[in-house]
Amino acid sequence: MSNENRTCSFCGKSKSHAKHLIEGKNAYICDECVANCLEILYEGDNGGTPPENAGGEPEESGKLPTPAEIVANLDDYVIGQGQAKKALAVAVYNHYKRLRHPKADGGVELSKSNILLIGPTGSGKTLLAQSLARKLDVPFVMADATTLTEAGYVGEDVEQIITKLLGKCDFDVEKARHGIVYIDEIDKISRKSDNPSITRDVSGEGVQQALLKLIEGTVASVPPQGGRKHPNQEFINVDTANILFICGGAFAGLEKVIRQRTEKGGIGFGASVHSKDENAGITKLFGIVEPEDLIKFGLIPELIGRLPVIATLEELDEDALINILTEPKNALVKQYQALFGIENVGLEFEEGALRSIARQAMERKTGARGLRSIVERCLLDTMYRLPDLQGLKKVVVGKAVIEEGREPELVFES
């Protein structure tokens, strides 16, 4: 039977008159007949009509973790960033509370509060979003804003974000509708120039407009199993109204915009004089960011309006980077110790080595993201030889290994 001649095997409705026509073995059923079957089944089992959310919003199961419980879980994986964790926890708790109670007392409809994370590279933005999704056990997907393009241009369409989200939950639409999407590098689609006061990049603004529709809530049409779109194709429709969007970026140069607003400089004796090293004040300035600063930076007002929760992350200092190396559940040192442990070999980092690793990461301005490459480089030769080193008991990494490129100390069984 051709596509055009397909009809519902129960009511006879043609494909052109049905919203969806689901194919079975030698039979078809339309969406209306599916709804009628659901109603009949519910009446038979419960002696009444199906609830308002039957066939729609899934019943939520389990206790929703409180903001304090969410923060406690984040503390296991992310060092520091107390204020950002608190802001995220409250926003996420309110979001999923809203999904469980779409209308509050008095019929008040609760709006969605998407989140904007502002912080330096390697400060933990992505890790916070990943840890949130893990704690809540919801589908999670990451997207890079710099790879997105407007519809009609070569590149990744914004709706492909939803395709990826569906893929994370085996194309279960109901699960996807309650997932979390993290869009990284959101600041990179705002402007071309290093000067944040210059007018926005037009193509970047087009991507912002496309993202705006997705974030505020639209029905995205996704090809089955993530294939390419083509005419006469059945699509999976996903309502994005209940998907939580978290956008993040380093926003390099935003501190200049904030400083222009807060410090009224002048000429002569009354002029404001800034030191050459102004990095120390960036975290403090990010903490007082206003929507008008983001607009001047290059984000469109409509997009900022759909990201009402703004959380700022602090720049990580040397002590924080050392803690990141050793304290979290998935700390880098613990990961390498586990790798060496598989070969029944111990691994020890001396305090001086840890401090040198942290110092090098700060000099590279890569934050926590640069720690792994430094550790990997100093252990590369040892890991290469590890399977062939018979009787090796322990590997000790000292300060000289990091700073002078020496070999780690190898301790063999006596």
From Swiss-Prot:
Amino-acid positions noted as binding Zn(2+) in the UniProt annotation, renumbered to this chain: C8, C11, C30, C33
All residue ranges annotated as the ClpX-type ZB domain in the record: 1-49
PROSITE patterns: CLPX_ZB (PS51902)
InterPro entries in the cross-refs: AAA+_ATPase, ATP-dep_Clp_protease_ClpX, ATPase_AAA_core, Clp_ATPase_C, Clp_protease_ATP-bd_su_ClpX, ClpX_bact, P-loop_NTPase, Znf_CppX_C4
Pfam families given in the database record: AAA_2, ClpB_D2-small, zf-C4_ClpX
Keywords, comma-separated and alphabetical: ATP-binding, Chaperone, Metal-binding, Nucleotide-binding, Zinc
Coiled coil segments of this chain: none
UniProt-annotated binding residues for ATP: P120, T121, G122, S123, G124, K125, T126, L127
Gene3D superfamilies linked to this entry: 1.10.8.60, ClpX chaperone, C4-type zinc finger domain, P-loop containing nucleotide triphosphate hydrolases
Molecular function in Gene Ontology: ATP binding; ATP hydrolysis activity; ATP-dependent protein folding chaperone; protein dimerization activity; unfolded protein binding; zinc ion binding
GO-annotated cellular components: HslUV protease complex
GO BP annotations listed: cell division; proteolysis involved in protein catabolic process
Subunit architecture: Component of the ClpX-ClpP complex. Forms a hexameric ring that, in the presence of ATP, binds to fourteen ClpP subunits assembled into a disk-like structure with a central cavity, resembling the structure of eukaryotic proteasomes.
Protein family membership: Belongs to the ClpX chaperone family.
Name by which UniProt lists this protein: ATP-dependent Clp protease ATP-binding subunit ClpX
Gene field: clpX
